[in-house]
């Protein structure tokens, strides 16, 4: 019987944590430390027209005509490796939307910081600035996306940045890789932070962490990376279904009869299928649904859903996607209907994505009684990506 040694599966863990990137190994002169670096560059052309009245940072041009914008959607630099043959680490610096609407003051930020220990193969104990699990799309890979924009617009987490927050979690495959669990405790909402004021009724008055996580059943294949692709483009098939939840005491936004704030609760269920077909073809289907509850009448209380479908013939893939959140207030809702074309030059490492979008953001959706619909914002986007 051949045993997997700790150093060997630690090295494998670092490779998988890279989410398929062409990581560049950097010699360190010792086996106690390993270092791999990679980068992701996304240049976007964005044509915008229609929608609500123009502003300095969004919508059509000030004249009301078509606005043309060229900017870096993402420019990131990552480092990952192992330490002392028992730990692994991952750190990512990213600048988002650099130069959009002529703004070159965008700060680079810590996007991910993960410190991990691997007690046995395919099981991780992690802490740091973590992607918060709720559904599979909630922990997706931004550079291996199927659609141009991710699910963040309808993930109404408390006090996060790009779905990330400080926390401690476990992440692993169990029972012959049939089940995946991912969850733990996270910082969540805090009085005086994340938009909350330090006044009564206090947000999270007891200072308790948020509980969150998801569980998945792997029907075909399995995934071990830290983030998950929208479409794999690797010649393998993956099918899974999952459920997820969040809870934090007195961290909602509706005041209850006893003068305290309501609890924050989120529920999710999702299905993912990526089928590799003969002749270098691939079909992908993503469906997920959400319930966010910040208390009765709160703007972030409501139901949401997201879906994507695509079919790849060799290097070309047409795709459709939608994002929908219907706030209980009926005036803080979100809707995006979109479709486009992906051109894979070197899988996800070099690709071009084109997409047409119709979006209602923080507004009123169609067919809402006693409410006037917010006009659609129209956009045509082209994005060039290089990852190595």
Question: Locations of the language-model features?
Answer:
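Detector for outer-membrane/organellar transmembrane beta-barrel domains
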Residues: 30, 206-208, 216-328, 335-338, ...
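Predominantly the C-terminal beta-signal and adjacent terminal strand-loop region
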Residues: 348-382
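Acidic/Ser/Thr-rich, low-complexity mid-to-C-terminal regulatory regions of eukaryotic proteins
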Residues: 184-186, 196-200
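Outer-membrane beta-barrel "beta-signal"
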Residues: 210-219, 374-388
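Outer membrane beta-barrel
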Residues: 24-191, 205-223, 301-337, 357, ...
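Bacterial N-terminal signal peptides that target proteins for export
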Residues: 1-10
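Flexible, solvent-exposed loop segments that connect beta-strands
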Residues: 52-64, 196-198, 253-260, 297, ...
């Amino acid at each position: 019987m051949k045993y997997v040694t700790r150093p060997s599966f630690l090295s494998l863990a670092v490779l998988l944590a890279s989410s398929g990137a062409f990581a560049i190994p950097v010699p360190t002169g010792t086996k106690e430390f390993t270092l791999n670096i990679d980068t992701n560059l996304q240049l976007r052309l964005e044509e915008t027209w229609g929608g609500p009245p123009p502003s300095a940072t969004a919508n059509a041009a000030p004249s009301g005509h078509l606005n043309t914008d060229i900017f870096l959607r993402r420019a990131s630099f990552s480092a990952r490796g192992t330490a002392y043959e028992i730990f692994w680490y991952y750190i990512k610096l990213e600048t988002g939307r650099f130069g959009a609407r002529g703004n070159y003051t965008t700060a680079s930020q810590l996007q991910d910081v993960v410190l991990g220990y691997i007690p046995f193969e395919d099981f991780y104990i992690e802490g740091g600035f973590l992607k918060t699990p709720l559904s599979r799309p909630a922990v997706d890979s931004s550079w291996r996306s199927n659609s141009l924009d991710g699910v963040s617009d309808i993930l109404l987490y408390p006090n996060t940045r790009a779905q990330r927050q400080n926390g401690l979690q476990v992440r692993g495959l169990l029972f012959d890789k049939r089940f995946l669990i991912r969850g733990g405790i996270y910082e969540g909402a805090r009085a005086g932070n994340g938009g909350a004021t330090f006044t009564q009724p206090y947000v999270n008055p007891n200072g308790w962490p948020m509980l969150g996580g998801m569980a998945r059943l792997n029907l075909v294949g399995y995934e071990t990376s830290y983030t998950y692709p929208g479409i794999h483009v690797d010649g393998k098939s993956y099918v899974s279904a999952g459920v997820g939840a969040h809870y934090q005491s007195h961290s909602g936004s509706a005041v209850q009869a006893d003068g305290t704030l309501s609890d924050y609760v989120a529920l999710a269920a999702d299905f993912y299928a990526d089928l590799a077909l003969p002749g270098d073809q691939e079909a992908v289907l993503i469906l997920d649904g959400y319930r966010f509850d910040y208390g009765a009448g709160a703007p972030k209380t409501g139901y949401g859903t997201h879906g994507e479908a695509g079919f790849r013939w060799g290097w070309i893939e047409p795709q459709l996607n939608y994002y929908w959140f219907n706030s209980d207030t009926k005036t803080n809702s979100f809707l995006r209907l979109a479709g486009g074309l992906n051109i894979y030059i070197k899988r996800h490492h070099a690709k071009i994505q084109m997409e047409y979008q119709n979006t209602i953001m923080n507004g009123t959706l169609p067919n809402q009684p006693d409410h006037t619909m917010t006009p659609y914002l129209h956009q045509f986007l082209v994005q060039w990506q290089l990852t190595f």
